[in-house]
Amino acid sequence: MMGQLSQSQDLGAGLKSRHVTMLSIAGVIGASLFVGSSVAIAEAGPAVLLAYLFAGLLVVMIMRMLAEMAVATPDTGSFSTYADKAIGRWAGYTIGWLYWWFWVLVIPLEANIAAIILHSWVPGVPVWLFSLVITLALTGSNLLSVKNYGEFEFWLALCKVVAILAFIVLGAVAITGFYPYAEVSGISRLWDHGGFMPNGFGAVLSAMLITMFSFMGAEIVTIAAAESDTPHKHIVRATNSVIWRISIFYLCSIFIVVALIPWNMQGLKSIGSYRSVLELLHIPYAKLIMDGVILLSVTSCLNSALYTASRMLYSLSRRGDAPTIMGRTNRSKTPYVAVLLSTGAAFLTVVVNYYAPAKVFKFLIDSSGAIALLVYLVIAVSQLRMRKILQAQGGEIRLRMWLYPYLTWLVIAFITFVLVVMLFRPAQQLEVISTGLLALGIICTVPIMSRWKKLVLWQKLPLQNTR
Protein backbone atom coordinates (compact mmCIF):
# COMPACT_ATOMS: atom_id res chain seq x y z
CA MET A 1 0.00 0.00 0.00
CA MET A 2 1.16 3.51 -0.76
CA GLY A 3 0.58 4.85 2.72
CA GLN A 4 2.19 1.93 4.45
CA LEU A 5 5.71 2.21 5.76
CA SER A 6 8.14 -0.28 4.33
CA GLN A 7 11.00 -0.96 6.69
CA SER A 8 14.32 -1.37 4.92
CA GLN A 9 16.16 -4.58 5.46
CA ASP A 10 19.45 -2.69 5.50
CA LEU A 11 18.89 0.65 7.27
CA GLY A 12 17.96 0.75 10.93
CA ALA A 13 15.55 2.96 12.84
CA GLY A 14 18.03 4.33 15.36
CA LEU A 15 16.83 7.94 15.48
CA LYS A 16 14.75 8.82 18.51
CA SER A 17 11.97 11.37 18.66
CA ARG A 18 14.20 14.02 20.25
CA HIS A 19 16.81 13.46 17.54
CA VAL A 20 14.35 14.04 14.69
CA THR A 21 12.78 17.02 16.48
CA MET A 22 16.13 18.74 16.94
CA LEU A 23 17.19 17.80 13.40
CA SER A 24 14.11 19.58 12.06
CA ILE A 25 15.16 22.69 13.98
CA ALA A 26 18.84 22.43 13.03
CA GLY A 27 17.91 22.02 9.38
CA VAL A 28 16.87 25.66 9.09
CA ILE A 29 19.78 27.07 11.11
CA GLY A 30 22.70 26.88 8.74
CA ALA A 31 26.10 28.45 9.23
CA SER A 32 25.22 30.92 6.46
CA LEU A 33 22.79 32.61 8.86
CA PHE A 34 25.79 33.82 10.85
CA VAL A 35 28.29 34.09 8.00
CA GLY A 36 26.22 35.22 5.02
CA SER A 37 23.49 37.41 6.53
CA SER A 38 25.77 40.47 6.58
CA VAL A 39 26.16 40.24 2.79
CA ALA A 40 22.38 40.14 2.33
CA ILE A 41 21.92 43.08 4.73
CA ALA A 42 24.54 45.14 2.89
CA GLU A 43 22.73 44.37 -0.37
CA ALA A 44 19.13 45.19 0.58
CA GLY A 45 19.37 47.22 3.79
CA PRO A 46 16.58 46.76 6.35
CA ALA A 47 14.39 45.40 3.53
CA VAL A 48 16.44 42.23 3.87
CA LEU A 49 13.57 41.24 6.17
CA LEU A 50 11.39 40.97 3.06
CA ALA A 51 14.03 38.80 1.40
CA TYR A 52 14.03 36.41 4.35
CA LEU A 53 10.23 36.54 4.50
CA PHE A 54 9.81 35.63 0.81
CA ALA A 55 12.47 32.92 0.97
CA GLY A 56 10.94 31.61 4.18
CA LEU A 57 7.45 31.46 2.68
CA LEU A 58 8.84 29.52 -0.27
CA VAL A 59 10.47 27.01 2.08
CA VAL A 60 7.23 26.65 4.06
CA MET A 61 5.35 25.83 0.84
CA ILE A 62 8.04 23.40 -0.31
CA MET A 63 8.16 21.64 3.06
CA ARG A 64 4.38 21.25 3.02
CA MET A 65 4.50 19.65 -0.44
CA LEU A 66 7.39 17.41 0.52
CA ALA A 67 5.67 16.39 3.73
CA GLU A 68 2.51 15.39 1.85
CA MET A 69 4.55 12.91 -0.17
CA ALA A 70 6.83 11.85 2.68
CA VAL A 71 3.95 11.04 5.03
CA ALA A 72 2.31 8.94 2.31
CA THR A 73 5.54 7.05 1.56
CA PRO A 74 8.52 7.70 3.89
CA ASP A 75 11.78 7.08 2.07
CA THR A 76 15.48 7.76 2.63
CA GLY A 77 15.66 9.04 -0.95
CA SER A 78 13.00 11.66 -0.13
CA PHE A 79 12.24 13.98 -3.07
CA SER A 80 14.55 12.05 -5.41
CA THR A 81 12.42 8.93 -4.96
CA TYR A 82 9.20 10.95 -5.31
CA ALA A 83 10.51 12.43 -8.58
CA ASP A 84 11.14 8.85 -9.72
CA LYS A 85 7.54 7.94 -9.01
CA ALA A 86 5.79 11.10 -10.17
CA ILE A 87 7.90 12.45 -13.04
CA GLY A 88 10.11 9.61 -14.23
CA ARG A 89 13.29 7.72 -13.46
CA TRP A 90 15.41 10.28 -15.30
CA ALA A 91 14.16 13.06 -12.99
CA GLY A 92 14.83 11.19 -9.75
CA TYR A 93 18.20 10.05 -11.09
CA THR A 94 19.25 13.57 -12.08
CA ILE A 95 18.06 15.45 -9.00
CA GLY A 96 19.43 12.72 -6.72
CA TRP A 97 22.94 13.03 -8.12
CA LEU A 98 22.73 16.83 -8.15
CA TYR A 99 21.70 16.84 -4.50
CA TRP A 100 24.50 14.43 -3.59
CA TRP A 101 26.98 16.69 -5.40
CA PHE A 102 25.72 19.74 -3.50
CA TRP A 103 26.43 18.16 -0.12
CA VAL A 104 29.77 16.71 -1.27
CA LEU A 105 30.88 20.27 -2.03
CA VAL A 106 29.59 21.48 1.33
CA ILE A 107 31.86 19.03 3.21
CA PRO A 108 35.25 20.62 2.34
CA LEU A 109 33.87 24.17 2.43
CA GLU A 110 32.50 23.80 5.97
CA ALA A 111 35.58 21.87 7.11
CA ASN A 112 37.77 24.71 5.86
CA ILE A 113 35.77 27.35 7.76
CA ALA A 114 36.01 25.29 10.96
CA ALA A 115 39.73 24.74 10.40
CA ILE A 116 40.40 28.47 9.90
CA ILE A 117 38.70 29.25 13.23
CA LEU A 118 40.64 26.53 15.05
CA HIS A 119 43.87 27.70 13.41
CA SER A 120 43.26 31.22 14.76
CA TRP A 121 43.07 29.70 18.23
CA VAL A 122 46.03 27.33 17.75
CA PRO A 123 48.30 28.93 15.10
CA GLY A 124 50.88 26.17 15.38
CA VAL A 125 48.58 23.64 13.70
CA PRO A 126 48.10 24.14 9.94
CA VAL A 127 44.62 24.68 8.50
CA TRP A 128 44.77 21.57 6.30
CA LEU A 129 45.46 19.34 9.31
CA PHE A 130 42.50 20.72 11.27
CA SER A 131 40.29 20.27 8.21
CA LEU A 132 41.47 16.68 7.74
CA VAL A 133 41.00 15.75 11.41
CA ILE A 134 37.48 17.26 11.60
CA THR A 135 36.33 15.53 8.42
CA LEU A 136 37.78 12.15 9.39
CA ALA A 137 36.35 12.39 12.93
CA LEU A 138 32.83 13.09 11.67
CA THR A 139 33.19 10.44 8.98
CA GLY A 140 34.07 7.94 11.70
CA SER A 141 31.07 9.03 13.74
CA ASN A 142 28.75 8.59 10.76
CA LEU A 143 30.18 5.13 10.11
CA LEU A 144 29.25 3.83 13.56
CA SER A 145 25.47 4.17 13.54
CA VAL A 146 22.68 6.59 12.68
CA LYS A 147 22.13 7.01 16.42
CA ASN A 148 25.62 8.52 16.69
CA TYR A 149 24.77 11.04 14.00
CA GLY A 150 21.47 11.86 15.69
CA GLU A 151 23.01 12.24 19.14
CA PHE A 152 25.90 14.39 17.93
CA GLU A 153 23.60 16.57 15.85
CA PHE A 154 21.15 16.88 18.75
CA TRP A 155 23.70 18.60 20.98
CA LEU A 156 25.15 20.75 18.21
CA ALA A 157 21.64 21.89 17.25
CA LEU A 158 20.77 22.58 20.88
CA CYS A 159 23.81 24.85 21.20
CA LYS A 160 22.78 26.76 18.06
CA VAL A 161 19.22 27.18 19.33
CA VAL A 162 20.39 28.44 22.73
CA ALA A 163 22.81 30.88 21.08
CA ILE A 164 20.16 32.39 18.80
CA LEU A 165 17.54 32.63 21.55
CA ALA A 166 20.07 34.34 23.83
CA PHE A 167 20.90 36.78 21.03
CA ILE A 168 17.21 37.58 20.47
CA VAL A 169 16.57 38.16 24.18
CA LEU A 170 19.66 40.37 24.48
CA GLY A 171 18.67 42.35 21.39
CA ALA A 172 15.08 42.78 22.57
CA VAL A 173 16.31 44.15 25.89
CA ALA A 174 18.51 46.64 24.02
CA ILE A 175 15.75 47.75 21.62
CA THR A 176 13.31 48.38 24.46
CA GLY A 177 15.89 50.56 26.24
CA PHE A 178 16.55 48.34 29.23
CA TYR A 179 20.13 47.43 28.34
CA PRO A 180 22.40 49.33 30.76
CA TYR A 181 25.80 48.90 29.07
CA ALA A 182 25.20 50.69 25.76
CA GLU A 183 23.30 53.79 24.67
CA VAL A 184 21.17 52.17 22.02
CA SER A 185 17.41 51.69 21.81
CA GLY A 186 14.47 51.91 19.44
CA ILE A 187 14.10 50.78 15.84
CA SER A 188 14.82 54.04 13.98
CA ARG A 189 17.75 52.42 12.15
CA LEU A 190 15.16 50.61 10.05
CA TRP A 191 14.63 53.86 8.08
CA ASP A 192 17.32 56.36 9.22
CA HIS A 193 19.88 55.46 6.54
CA GLY A 194 18.13 55.93 3.20
CA GLY A 195 14.78 54.43 4.15
CA PHE A 196 13.56 50.89 4.68
CA MET A 197 14.36 49.88 1.09
CA PRO A 198 17.39 52.05 0.23
CA ASN A 199 18.51 50.08 -2.84
CA GLY A 200 15.11 49.28 -4.32
CA PHE A 201 13.21 46.03 -4.81
CA GLY A 202 15.86 44.67 -7.17
CA ALA A 203 18.26 44.57 -4.23
CA VAL A 204 15.66 42.68 -2.20
CA LEU A 205 15.50 40.05 -4.94
CA SER A 206 19.30 39.82 -4.98
CA ALA A 207 19.31 39.40 -1.21
CA MET A 208 16.66 36.70 -1.49
CA LEU A 209 18.94 34.73 -3.80
CA ILE A 210 21.64 34.99 -1.13
CA THR A 211 19.29 33.96 1.68
CA MET A 212 17.94 31.00 -0.28
CA PHE A 213 21.14 29.11 0.43
CA SER A 214 20.56 29.58 4.17
CA PHE A 215 17.41 27.45 4.12
CA MET A 216 18.96 24.52 2.25
CA GLY A 217 18.84 21.65 4.72
CA ALA A 218 15.27 22.05 5.93
CA GLU A 219 14.39 18.99 3.85
CA ILE A 220 16.91 16.75 5.66
CA VAL A 221 14.32 15.87 8.29
CA THR A 222 12.30 13.95 5.67
CA ILE A 223 15.40 11.88 4.92
CA ALA A 224 16.29 11.31 8.57
CA ALA A 225 12.72 10.54 9.64
CA ALA A 226 12.78 7.43 7.44
CA GLU A 227 15.31 5.99 9.92
CA SER A 228 12.98 6.38 12.90
CA ASP A 229 10.17 4.19 14.23
CA THR A 230 7.32 6.58 13.37
CA PRO A 231 8.46 8.66 10.38
CA HIS A 232 5.05 10.06 9.43
CA LYS A 233 4.54 11.53 12.93
CA HIS A 234 7.94 13.21 12.92
CA ILE A 235 7.43 14.61 9.43
CA VAL A 236 4.02 16.06 10.30
CA ARG A 237 5.41 17.63 13.47
CA ALA A 238 8.43 19.09 11.68
CA THR A 239 6.29 20.50 8.86
CA ASN A 240 3.75 22.08 11.18
CA SER A 241 6.51 23.79 13.16
CA VAL A 242 8.56 25.09 10.22
CA ILE A 243 6.68 28.41 10.24
CA TRP A 244 7.60 29.35 13.81
CA ARG A 245 11.14 28.04 13.35
CA ILE A 246 11.76 30.36 10.40
CA SER A 247 9.98 33.23 12.17
CA ILE A 248 12.07 32.96 15.33
CA PHE A 249 15.48 31.95 14.09
CA TYR A 250 15.57 34.09 10.95
CA LEU A 251 13.04 36.92 10.99
CA CYS A 252 13.38 37.77 14.68
CA SER A 253 17.17 37.56 14.81
CA ILE A 254 17.65 39.51 11.55
CA PHE A 255 15.15 42.12 12.79
CA ILE A 256 17.31 42.56 15.89
CA VAL A 257 20.37 43.09 13.69
CA VAL A 258 18.91 45.70 11.31
CA ALA A 259 17.16 47.48 14.20
CA LEU A 260 20.38 47.92 16.18
CA ILE A 261 23.10 48.55 13.59
CA PRO A 262 23.11 50.66 10.39
CA TRP A 263 22.85 48.45 7.31
CA ASN A 264 25.63 50.44 5.63
CA MET A 265 27.99 50.27 8.60
CA GLN A 266 31.63 50.17 7.54
CA GLY A 267 33.13 46.70 7.79
CA LEU A 268 29.79 44.92 8.22
CA LYS A 269 30.56 42.29 5.58
CA SER A 270 33.96 41.43 7.03
CA ILE A 271 33.01 41.56 10.71
CA GLY A 272 29.62 39.89 10.40
CA SER A 273 26.16 41.08 11.44
CA TYR A 274 25.82 39.18 14.72
CA ARG A 275 29.29 40.03 15.95
CA SER A 276 28.67 43.69 15.06
CA VAL A 277 25.61 43.71 17.33
CA LEU A 278 27.53 42.08 20.19
CA GLU A 279 30.33 44.64 19.87
CA LEU A 280 27.78 47.47 19.78
CA LEU A 281 26.39 46.16 23.07
CA HIS A 282 29.92 45.96 24.51
CA ILE A 283 29.75 42.23 25.05
CA PRO A 284 33.26 41.08 26.02
CA TYR A 285 35.00 38.59 23.74
CA ALA A 286 32.40 39.15 21.01
CA LYS A 287 34.71 37.77 18.31
CA LEU A 288 35.54 34.68 20.37
CA ILE A 289 31.85 34.06 21.10
CA MET A 290 30.83 34.32 17.45
CA ASP A 291 33.77 32.20 16.33
CA GLY A 292 32.58 29.53 18.77
CA VAL A 293 29.00 29.71 17.50
CA ILE A 294 30.12 29.59 13.87
CA LEU A 295 32.41 26.64 14.66
CA LEU A 296 29.47 24.73 16.14
CA SER A 297 27.30 25.65 13.16
CA VAL A 298 29.75 24.58 10.48
CA THR A 299 30.51 21.37 12.38
CA SER A 300 26.78 20.65 12.51
CA CYS A 301 26.45 21.42 8.80
CA LEU A 302 29.44 19.21 7.98
CA ASN A 303 27.96 16.38 10.04
CA SER A 304 24.63 16.71 8.23
CA ALA A 305 26.36 16.97 4.85
CA LEU A 306 28.09 13.62 5.42
CA TYR A 307 24.85 12.02 6.56
CA THR A 308 22.70 13.45 3.77
CA ALA A 309 25.16 12.73 0.96
CA SER A 310 25.59 9.13 2.09
CA ARG A 311 21.83 8.51 2.39
CA MET A 312 21.13 9.95 -1.04
CA LEU A 313 23.90 7.83 -2.55
CA TYR A 314 22.53 4.77 -0.73
CA SER A 315 19.03 5.48 -2.05
CA LEU A 316 20.31 5.91 -5.60
CA SER A 317 22.06 2.56 -5.32
CA ARG A 318 18.97 0.81 -3.95
CA ARG A 319 16.95 2.10 -6.89
CA GLY A 320 19.55 0.94 -9.39
CA ASP A 321 20.68 4.48 -10.21
CA ALA A 322 24.18 3.98 -8.76
CA PRO A 323 26.53 0.98 -8.50
CA THR A 324 25.22 -1.75 -6.19
CA ILE A 325 28.27 -1.56 -3.92
CA MET A 326 27.16 1.90 -2.74
CA GLY A 327 24.13 0.31 -1.10
CA ARG A 328 26.12 -1.97 1.21
CA THR A 329 25.63 -1.59 4.96
CA ASN A 330 27.62 -2.71 8.01
CA ARG A 331 26.50 -4.40 11.23
CA SER A 332 25.17 -1.08 12.52
CA LYS A 333 22.98 -0.84 9.40
CA THR A 334 24.96 2.16 8.22
CA PRO A 335 25.68 2.58 4.48
CA TYR A 336 29.43 2.63 5.07
CA VAL A 337 30.44 2.51 1.40
CA ALA A 338 28.26 5.54 0.64
CA VAL A 339 29.75 7.41 3.63
CA LEU A 340 33.33 6.64 2.56
CA LEU A 341 32.73 7.45 -1.11
CA SER A 342 31.05 10.76 -0.25
CA THR A 343 34.00 11.71 1.96
CA GLY A 344 36.42 10.58 -0.75
CA ALA A 345 34.65 12.70 -3.35
CA ALA A 346 34.88 15.69 -1.00
CA PHE A 347 38.63 15.17 -0.61
CA LEU A 348 38.92 14.92 -4.39
CA THR A 349 37.43 18.40 -4.76
CA VAL A 350 40.12 19.67 -2.36
CA VAL A 351 42.79 18.09 -4.57
CA VAL A 352 41.21 19.76 -7.60
CA ASN A 353 41.36 23.08 -5.75
CA TYR A 354 45.12 22.73 -5.24
CA TYR A 355 46.24 21.18 -8.52
CA ALA A 356 43.67 22.01 -11.22
CA PRO A 357 43.33 25.43 -12.88
CA ALA A 358 41.35 27.95 -10.82
CA LYS A 359 38.59 28.02 -13.44
CA VAL A 360 37.94 24.30 -12.94
CA PHE A 361 37.36 24.62 -9.20
CA LYS A 362 35.28 27.76 -9.71
CA PHE A 363 33.04 25.81 -12.10
CA LEU A 364 32.65 23.04 -9.50
CA ILE A 365 31.59 25.55 -6.84
CA ASP A 366 29.32 27.52 -9.19
CA SER A 367 27.67 24.28 -10.32
CA SER A 368 26.01 23.99 -6.90
CA GLY A 369 24.65 27.54 -6.97
CA ALA A 370 21.16 26.85 -8.34
CA ILE A 371 20.74 23.28 -7.08
CA ALA A 372 18.54 24.41 -4.18
CA LEU A 373 16.06 26.01 -6.58
CA LEU A 374 16.10 22.95 -8.85
CA VAL A 375 15.39 20.72 -5.84
CA TYR A 376 12.46 22.95 -4.86
CA LEU A 377 11.15 22.95 -8.43
CA VAL A 378 11.31 19.15 -8.65
CA ILE A 379 9.51 18.82 -5.29
CA ALA A 380 6.70 21.10 -6.50
CA VAL A 381 6.26 19.30 -9.83
CA SER A 382 6.40 15.91 -8.10
CA GLN A 383 3.73 16.90 -5.59
CA LEU A 384 1.52 18.27 -8.36
CA ARG A 385 1.56 14.89 -10.10
CA MET A 386 1.80 12.64 -7.04
CA ARG A 387 -1.49 13.94 -5.61
CA LYS A 388 -3.30 12.84 -8.78
CA ILE A 389 -1.63 9.42 -8.66
CA LEU A 390 -2.56 8.94 -5.00
CA GLN A 391 -6.15 9.95 -5.60
CA ALA A 392 -6.42 7.65 -8.62
CA GLN A 393 -5.17 4.71 -6.55
CA GLY A 394 -7.39 5.56 -3.58
CA GLY A 395 -4.37 6.11 -1.34
CA GLU A 396 -4.76 7.89 1.99
CA ILE A 397 -3.46 11.47 2.05
CA ARG A 398 -2.86 12.28 5.72
CA LEU A 399 -1.24 15.66 5.17
CA ARG A 400 -2.35 17.94 2.34
CA MET A 401 -0.75 20.89 0.59
CA TRP A 402 -2.80 24.05 1.07
CA LEU A 403 -4.97 25.32 -1.82
CA TYR A 404 -3.88 22.54 -4.16
CA PRO A 405 -3.16 22.90 -7.06
CA TYR A 406 -3.12 26.72 -7.10
CA LEU A 407 -0.37 27.29 -4.54
CA THR A 408 1.71 24.54 -6.12
CA TRP A 409 1.45 26.18 -9.53
CA LEU A 410 2.27 29.56 -7.96
CA VAL A 411 5.44 28.12 -6.40
CA ILE A 412 6.46 26.53 -9.72
CA ALA A 413 5.95 29.86 -11.51
CA PHE A 414 7.87 31.77 -8.83
CA ILE A 415 10.88 29.42 -8.90
CA THR A 416 10.94 29.54 -12.70
CA PHE A 417 10.84 33.34 -12.55
CA VAL A 418 13.75 33.44 -10.09
CA LEU A 419 15.84 31.10 -12.26
CA VAL A 420 15.20 33.28 -15.32
CA VAL A 421 16.15 36.42 -13.36
CA MET A 422 19.36 34.72 -12.17
CA LEU A 423 20.18 33.82 -15.76
CA PHE A 424 20.19 37.51 -16.74
CA ARG A 425 21.97 38.84 -13.65
CA PRO A 426 25.78 38.87 -14.00
CA ALA A 427 26.28 37.96 -10.33
CA GLN A 428 24.26 34.73 -10.60
CA GLN A 429 24.45 33.99 -14.32
CA LEU A 430 27.43 31.64 -14.08
CA GLU A 431 25.78 29.69 -11.26
CA VAL A 432 22.66 28.95 -13.31
CA ILE A 433 24.67 28.04 -16.41
CA SER A 434 27.08 25.82 -14.43
CA THR A 435 24.24 24.04 -12.63
CA GLY A 436 22.40 23.62 -15.93
CA LEU A 437 25.47 22.15 -17.64
CA LEU A 438 26.02 19.76 -14.73
CA ALA A 439 22.36 18.67 -14.85
CA LEU A 440 22.58 18.10 -18.61
CA GLY A 441 25.77 16.13 -18.11
CA ILE A 442 24.04 13.86 -15.58
CA ILE A 443 21.03 13.41 -17.88
CA CYS A 444 23.40 12.38 -20.68
CA THR A 445 24.63 9.49 -18.50
CA VAL A 446 21.10 8.06 -18.30
CA PRO A 447 21.45 5.93 -21.46
CA ILE A 448 24.83 4.65 -20.21
CA MET A 449 23.38 3.67 -16.83
CA SER A 450 20.37 2.18 -18.58
CA ARG A 451 22.54 -0.16 -20.63
CA TRP A 452 24.89 -0.99 -17.75
CA LYS A 453 22.18 -1.74 -15.22
CA LYS A 454 19.70 -2.94 -17.85
CA LEU A 455 17.12 -0.50 -16.50
CA VAL A 456 14.68 1.75 -18.28
CA LEU A 457 15.41 5.08 -16.59
CA TRP A 458 12.80 6.93 -18.64
CA GLN A 459 9.95 5.08 -16.96
CA LYS A 460 8.36 5.81 -13.60
CA LEU A 461 8.93 3.72 -10.51
CA PRO A 462 5.93 1.95 -8.97
CA LEU A 463 4.48 3.65 -5.91
CA GLN A 464 6.21 1.65 -3.21
CA ASN A 465 8.83 2.50 -0.64
CA THR A 466 12.49 1.89 -1.41
CA ARG A 467 13.80 3.04 1.92
What are these regions (language model features)?
Residues T81-Y82, G88, S120, G194, ...:
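TM-loop-TM module centered on a large, flexible mid-protein loop between adjacent transmembrane helices
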Residues M1-S8, T81-D84, W90, A111-S131, ...:
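Helix-loop-helix connectors at the membrane interface of multi-pass transporters/channels
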Residues M1-G36, I41-A47, V59-R64, T76, ...:
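Membrane-interface "cap" regions at the ends of multi-pass membrane proteins
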Residues W155-L156, I325-K333, L373-L430, V456-Q459, ...:
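C-terminal membrane-solvent junction of multi-pass transporters and transport-like membrane proteins
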Residues D75, L98-N112, F215-S228, Y250, ...:
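Membrane-helix boundary/coupling elements in multi-pass transport proteins
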Residues W128-S185, M216, T239-I243, I365-V378, ...:
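Membrane-interface loop-to-helix entry segments
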Residues G12, I25, V35-F130, I134, ...:
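Extracellular loop-to-transmembrane helix junctions
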Residues S6-L11, V48-L49, P123-P126, L158-D291:
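Helix-loop-helix junctions that connect adjacent transmembrane segments
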